[in-house]
A protein has these predicted regions:
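Membrane-proximal intracellular helices of multi-pass ion channels
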Residues: 1-480
């Protein structure tokens, strides 16, 4: 392990977080929240000082392999979450450090699971920081770093592979740093467009900003106790559309910018993603029709919740825990499917399910006809065995972690549905589950131990499991 270069990278991350913490301080200044502003300024100073201290470490070697990539990724997310939790504790909004860490990790990992029973009484600076963590974490803190810093050798690729969602990383252009800039450019542009549409619908500037942060990062922190239930149908439709758009592989947007419309539309993953959404909306709309006055209202709530769950955003337009069993079962299944690879969404990812389906088809063919060569293809390209192997290992690790987490949180004594959906909601970065952790409930009743398990799940889900698991391997920490 090249400790020096990992710590130096952590220094960059903490310096960036120190700068970002100034934005909620400015928000507190605007709303004359002087004590809250002081807390954010203090936290920003601590983060910047920590970053400057780590930056003084000079690595003797600039070699940066996947081991360093995994460790730097996991440690970076842990570090920004610990520092990001400080304002919650010092302002007294969340005095319990474990609860504050849970809330912050939930923000950065774009999970949106909360321990707060009510949010409308929180200072505006804290509300801004909660939602802003979604936007920071949506595209990835290291992707942001890559867009700014000229790292050497294969460092760019190893960092992006360690943090990026999906079975493989596609470079949009030859230079990874340029790819990171393009991704953030698209991310920022879509956020601004949604912000403008929300303003046009009568939502005020502050609420529009928080909503755009949450939607862009596919996080689920609301600033109203009932999430989006009290907003107009126009606002709900705008949020629905943009949740779905942020769940699309960003490579497709890059192709659209290049006017390669046919290639963008031919993506098997994107087509499957929209197909799943349409099918789920149709099934749920029919199933919940009797609960609402008009077909249009049922369609709106079905589309909102399907978009929210499959993209792992976690916003709510109603209490879907009161829906019929079939509708809730469809939503739970969507929790596992997730959004597209290369998007800001979580879950297992549509591309992995496509690969699993194609691999299963290949195995069935060869079981019937052993001599037949049946290659697996995605978008007309041959999928190599390494990608298939990595996908299978990921699914195995996912099942193991899900089962272990379920057993551990069950020690708190809650019912099976609550525990199962709690793990599903955190490991897939969804936010709300069912029963005691439903859309109008929260995770506050869990013990500190269970919350720490769920914190690990949120980080593991956002980082595609492997970076968090390798922290437990002795080989990770051996010097070379």
């Amino acid at each position: 392990m090249n400790y020096a270069i990992v710590f130096r990278l952590l220094g960059y991350i903490q310096m960036i977080e120190g700068v970002l913490l100034l934005l909620p301080a400015v928000t507190s200044l605007i709303y004359a929240e002087w004590a809250v502003m002081g807390v954010f300024l203090l936290t920003a100073a601590i983060s910047a000082a920590l970053g400057l201290g780590l930056r003084t470490i000079k690595p003797r070697s600039k070699v940066f392999y996947m081991r360093e990539g995994f460790a730097a990724t996991a440690l970076s997310w842990i570090a920004i979450s610990i520092v990001g939790a400080v304002p919650f504790v010092l302002t007294g909004c969340i005095p319990n450090p474990v609860d504050a860490l849970f809330e912050t990790v939930s923000g950065f990992t774009t999970t949106g699971a909360s321990i707060l029973p009510a949010v409308e009484g929180l200072p505006n600076g804290i509300l801004f920081w909660r939602s802003f963590t979604h936007w920071i974490g949506g595209m990835g803190v290291l992707v942001f770093l890559l867009s700014l810093l000229p790292l050497t050798g294969g460092s760019h690729v190893n960092l992006m592979k360690a943090e990026s969602p999906g079975p493989q990383v596609d470079k949009l252009v030859p230079k990874v740093q340029s790819t990171a800039k393009i991704l953030y450019g698209i991310y920022f542009a879509l956020t601004v467009v949604e912000f403008c549409f929300l303003l046009a619908g009568g939502m005020n500037v502050f609420d529009s900003l928080l909503t755009s942060f949450g939607t862009a990062g596919t996080g689920g922190f609301g600033f109203k106790n009932d999430s989006f239930a009290s907003f107009s149908p126009y606002i709900q439709w705008v949020v629905t559309i943009f949740m779905i758009l942020f769940g699309v592989n960003f490579n497709a947007y890059f192709l659209l910018l290049l006017r390669r419309f046919r290639r963008a539309a031919s993506s098997e993953e994107v087509r499957a993603y929209f197909g799943i959404i349409l099918a789920a909306v149709a099934v749920i709309t029919v199933n919940i029709r009797s609960l609402y006055g008009t077909f249009g209202e049922a369609l709106r709530h079905a589309a909102f919740q399907v978009g929210s769950i499959i993209t792992t955003t976690g916003f709510s337009s109603c209490d879907f825990d009161l829906w019929p069993t079939l509708a809730k079962e469809v939503l739970v299944l969507l929790m596992f499917v997730g959004a597209c690879a290369g998007s800001t969404g979580g879950g297992i990812k549509v591309s992995r399910f496509l690969l699993l389906g194609k691999t299963l088809g290949k195995e069935l063919k060869q079981a019937l006809h052993p001599q037949v060569v049946a290659p697996v293809r995605m978008d007309g390209k041959l999928v190599n065995h390494e990608t298939i192997r990595t996908t299978n290992v990921y699914i195995a690790a996912y099942i193991f972690l899900f089962g272990a987490s379920l057993m551990l949180v069950s020690l708190d004594g809650f019912d099976m549905v609550t525990n199962f959906t709690s793990v599903a909601a955190t490991l897939n970065n969804i936010g709300p589950g069912l029963n005691q952790v439903g859309p109008m409930m929260n995770f506050g009743a869990y013990s500190n131990f269970a919350k720490l398990v769920l914190i690990f799940d949120m980080l593991a889900g956002r980082l595609e499991i492997f970076p968090m698991l390798v922290l437990f391997l002795p080989d990770t920490w051996r010097r070379f």
